[in-house]
From Swiss-Prot:
The gene is rpl33. The lineage of its organism: Eukaryota, Sar, Rhizaria, Cercozoa, Imbricatea. This is Large ribosomal subunit protein bL33c. It comes from the Eukaryota. GO terms for molecular function: structural constituent of ribosome. It holds the Pfam family Ribosomal_L33.
Amino acid sequence: MAKNKGVRLVITLECTECRSNSAKRSPGVSRYTTEKNRRNTTERLEIKKFCPHCNKSAIHKEIK
């Protein structure tokens, strides 16, 4: 019998300021991977995390 996937889902968080900001410390876009419980959090995740390219804490939004 096949097992179900479960409620935990691996997602990718991407910096929102890296995409629009041209004056950055280094080129590139900051990405983090994490898990979320799709039963508790149905909408897209937004977390404030440190971005090494912007060199500050910025909002990271879920992309996958």
